[in-house]
């Protein structure tokens, strides 16, 4: 077991079940307890927004868990700027819902890892695709699937300017463990569908019917595979 200092964050909030599952993963991988800096409420879809014109409040839950009024990217900035400056890796998630293809540009989960990369810290964004009509998400199973993947990715040499994006599929409770597929992000844009009601426009696109390129992360995860994609910033 390594002695890496792992920083954990998410966009679903400090009390989210997915973040608790990610703590399980971190505790299996490193002998050092992880540091958690996460939003005090849900910031899903926050993208890479950061706070520079107003104050951020930080609530210390204990000596290694902090909740903040900031966005996911703010959480990483706060950590590296004072709460946990000696971080080795940034892990974000496990997001409730997929962050596949074009989602990486809107996801607060992915933005947190991207912010770490900008400051020279390697990272892994982790998400769990959610499909209607299937058994509830099993976060203990998600942690079990994710642990060997994160351990493997952390053991590899890091190329500055890159990060890993991992998506878990939503399969039935009785299904066999999914295969792991290394693949590219799907470049297809999300659907441009809106419904007009009383002068207001409501997004009406169906995430589960989104366009997809065969063999891409969207295609593979929707078919039941764990997808691992290397994302390059520069």
Q: What label would you give each PLM region?
A:
Residues 137-234:
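Electrostatically charged, flexible surface regions
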Residues 79-84, 111-122:
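Alpha-helix C-terminal capping segments
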Residues 117-141:
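Glycine-rich phosphate/pyrophosphate-binding loops
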Residues 2-6, 20-86:
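A cross-family phosphate/adenosyl-ligand binding-site feature
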Residues 98-107:
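Glycine/threonine-rich flexible loop motifs
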């Amino acid at each position: 077991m390594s002695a890496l200092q792992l920083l954990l964050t998410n966009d679903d909030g400090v009390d989210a079940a997915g973040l608790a599952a990610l703590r399980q993963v971190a505790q299996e991988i490193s002998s050092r307890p992880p540091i958690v800096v996460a939003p005090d409420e849900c910031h899903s879809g926050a993208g890479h927004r950061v706070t520079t014109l107003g104050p951020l409040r930080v609530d210390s839950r204990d000596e290694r868990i902090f909740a903040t009024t900031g966005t996911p990217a703010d959480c990483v900035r706060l950590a590296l700027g004072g709460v946990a400056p000696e971080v080795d890796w940034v892990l974000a998630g496990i997001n409730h819902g997929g962050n596949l293809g074009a989602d990486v540009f809107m996801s607060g989960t992915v933005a947190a890892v991207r912010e770490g990369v900008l400051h020279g810290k390697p990272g892994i964004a982790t998400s769990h695709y959610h499909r209607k009509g299937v058994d509830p998400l099993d976060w203990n199973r998600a942690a079990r699937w994710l642990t060997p993947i994160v351990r493997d990715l952390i053991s590899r040499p890091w190329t500055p300017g890159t990060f890993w994006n991992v998506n878990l599929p939503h399969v039935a409770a009785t299904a066999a463990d999914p295969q792991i597929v290394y693949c590219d992000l799907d470049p297809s844009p999300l659907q441009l569908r809106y419904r007009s009601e009383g002068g207001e426009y409501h997004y009406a696109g169906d995430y589960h019917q989104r366009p997809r390129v065969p063999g891409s992360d969207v295609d593979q995860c929707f078919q039941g595979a764990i997808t691992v994609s290397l994302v390059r910033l520069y």
